[in-house]
């Protein structure tokens, strides 16, 4: 009903503001609606104010940024191949990461979760020293909040409604998982923070840079839009240049970036996967380019650092330190490359007293133990790295995982610690929510495109899962129910 009401309102607004016939508007998808994709049979144009952007062969979406209705042809039938992630004590699989959602309704007004403490404005440059999360508040992700309010809440009842509303207010990261979002969503996200600061706040923006060519090389669920064989490195550098342009336009907004989840960790453990071996040089070149280009005074960057059940195994720690230490040096030791983000889209706890059975025999069975073991090895390579830890889905411990390497839509998990710079650790800058809880990790249907076997029910994944990035209501409700601290 909510979506129908929004569509009606959008149609009415279009009719009032434009001489075009209502019938023409009704033939085009509303903002955030689907406008193309494999086997899609709906509208292939967008209403005024949006443009149809191809995310992948299965999905195109109407994103803000065009003044006229636009069209896109349906993608041709094809398939993408990928080698599934491995699972062994020294080569643990990465966690899944979101791609563009299939339907995102209009954003709603949200309010920051903490009290404003000061601000800045256009024409100035934000700056900080040390921990970029210290002395600043985080702003809710309106893109994610809109999903919660219009995709999740309408079908909830009782106490879950209030819990979901609370989740919508928790600050989380906005993902730039396709190049088009740099021009459509990124300016709005930064403008929201600028406006809040102008009203007396002191807020930072949180973004994920995620569009490497041959992305997600060890899995199938989140393959991206760029291919190394088709000029992907050049296209990626243009994507980074576009991000830099937006950051310079909003130099008054302190911005925290997570750089390329599920990428370089594969270069440590998954060189036996042909796609990863073939992508290594491109991954390194692209990542170095990114951290050099985005090395701006108001920006803090964190490379993705896997998690305790991946790079945290003793046999993986030194090779990981060697790789990241060399990259840091090869990039010229960027001043704004603060450290690493761990546990992105995964389920690990921060600090446990008892090891879950599925973590045996790894002595680094939580993220605190992992970074405590990893940091000295990085320091020995010349990088005094600090860490941020994703706790968005780490509330329930132990989880329902059968094995630690099972990463996709795992059951028995819940929303976790709320974002905070009060970590009690000199190494940990902040607890954060990087993965948007409720967006699917990967499709569970073995016959579907982009199916990864880790997303099958035999691996503990929840059934009836849609494609990666699509809203997964049943999973979201589980996260609400199992939240710790409770919502």
Curated annotation (Swiss-Prot):
pH dependence: Optimum pH is 4.5-9.0.
Disulfide bridge map: 35-52, 46-62
GO terms assigned for molecular function: cellulose 1,4-beta-cellobiosidase activity; cellulose binding
Entry superkingdom: Eukaryota
Any one annotated GO CC term: extracellular region
Protein source organism: Pyricularia oryzae (strain 70-15 / ATCC MYA-4617 / FGSC 8958) (Rice blast fungus)
Protein name: 1,4-beta-D-glucan cellobiohydrolase CEL6A
Classification via InterPro entries: Beta_cellobiohydrolase, Beta_cellobiohydrolase_sf, CBD_sf, Cellulose-bd_dom_fun, Glyco_hydro_6_CS
Chain residues that bind substrate: 175, 177, 307, 310, 346, 407, 435, 439
Gene3D superfamilies, per database record: 1, 4-beta cellobiohydrolase
One biological process term in Gene Ontology: cellulose catabolic process
Function: Exoglucanase that plays an important function in biomass degradation by catalyzing the hydrolysis of the non-reducing end beta-1,4-glucosidic linkages in cellulose and cellotetraose to release cellobiose. Shows higher hydrolytic activities on phosphoric acid-swollen cellulose (PSC), beta-glucan, and cellooligosaccharide derivatives than on cellulose, of which the best substrates were cellooligosaccharides.
Pfam families membership: CBM_1, Glyco_hydro_6
Region (Disordered): 64-127
Entry EC number(s): 3.2.1.91
Name of the top EC class for this enzyme: hydrolase
Catalytic residues as annotated in Swiss-Prot or TrEMBL: 216, 262, 441
Signal peptide range in chain numbering: 1-17
Thermal dependence, as annotated: Optimum temperature is 30-50 degrees Celsius.
Other remarks in the entry: The biological conversion of cellulose to glucose generally requires three types of hydrolytic enzymes: (1) Endoglucanases which cut internal beta-1,4-glucosidic bonds; (2) Exocellobiohydrolases that cut the disaccharide cellobiose from the non-reducing end of the cellulose polymer chain; (3) Beta-1,4-glucosidases which hydrolyze the cellobiose and other short cello-oligosaccharides to glucose.
SUPFAM superfamilies (UniProt xref): Cellulose-binding domain, Glycosyl hydrolases family 6, cellulases
């Amino acid at each position: 009903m909510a979506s129908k009401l929004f569509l009606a309102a959008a149609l009415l607004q279009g009719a009032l503001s434009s001489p075009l016939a209502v019938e023409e508007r009704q033939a085009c998808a509303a903002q955030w609606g689907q406008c193309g994709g494999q086997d899609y049979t709906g509208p292939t144009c967008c209403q005024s104010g949006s443009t149809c952007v191809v995310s992948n062969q299965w999905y195109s979406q109407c994103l803000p940024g065009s003044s006229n209705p636009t069209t896109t042809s349906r993608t041709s039938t094809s398939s993408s191949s990928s080698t599934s992630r491995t699972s062994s004590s020294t080569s643990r699989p990465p966690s899944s990461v979101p791609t563009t959602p299939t339907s995102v309704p209009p954003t709603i007004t949200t309010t920051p979760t903490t009290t404003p403490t000061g601000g800045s404005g256009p024409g100035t440059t934000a700056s900080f020293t040390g921990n970029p999360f210290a002395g600043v508040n985080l702003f809710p992700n309106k893109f994610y909040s809109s999903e919660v309010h219009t995709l999740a809440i309408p079908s909830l009842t009782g106490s879950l409604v209030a819990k979901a509303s609370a989740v919508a207010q928790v600050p989380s990261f906005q993902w730039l998982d396709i190049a088009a979002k740099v021009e459509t969503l990124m300016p709005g996200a930064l403008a929201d923070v600028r406006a809040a600061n102008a009203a007396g706040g002191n807020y930072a923006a949180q973004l994920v840079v995620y569009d490497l060519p041959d992305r997600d090389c060890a899995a199938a669920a989140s393959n991206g839009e760029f291919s190394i064989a088709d000029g992907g490195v050049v296209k990626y550098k243009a994507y980074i240049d576009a991000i830099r342009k937006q950051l310079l336009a909003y130099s008054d907004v302190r911005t925290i970036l997570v750089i390329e989840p599920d990428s370089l960790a594969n270069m440590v453990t998954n060189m036996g996967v042909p796609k990863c071996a073939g992508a290594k040089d491109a991954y390194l070149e692209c990542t170095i380019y990114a951290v050099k280009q985005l090395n701006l005074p108001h920006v803090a960057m964190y490379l993705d650092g896997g998690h305790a059940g991946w790079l945290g195994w003793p046999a993986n720690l030194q090779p990981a330190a060697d790789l990241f230490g060399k990259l840091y040096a090869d990039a010229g030791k960027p001043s704004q490359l603060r450290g690493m983000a761990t546990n992105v889209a995964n389920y690990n706890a921060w600090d446990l007293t008892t090891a879950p059975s599925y973590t045996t025999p790894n002595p680094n069975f939580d993220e605190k133990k992992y970074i405590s073991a990893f940091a000295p090895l990085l320091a020995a390579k010349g990088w005094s790295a600090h860490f941020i830890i994703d706790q968005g889905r780490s509330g329930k411990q132990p989880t329902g995982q059968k094995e630690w390497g099972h990463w996709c839509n795992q059951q028995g998990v819940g929303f976790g610690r709320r974002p905070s710079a009060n970590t009690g650790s000199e190494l940990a800058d902040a607890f954060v929510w990087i993965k948007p809880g409720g967006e699917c990790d990967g499709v569970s249907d073995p016959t579907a495109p982009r199916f990864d076997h880790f997303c099958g029910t035999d691996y503990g994944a929840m059934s009836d899962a849609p494609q990666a990035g699509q809203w997964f209501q049943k999973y979201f409700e589980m996260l609400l129910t199992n939240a710790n601290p409770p919502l």
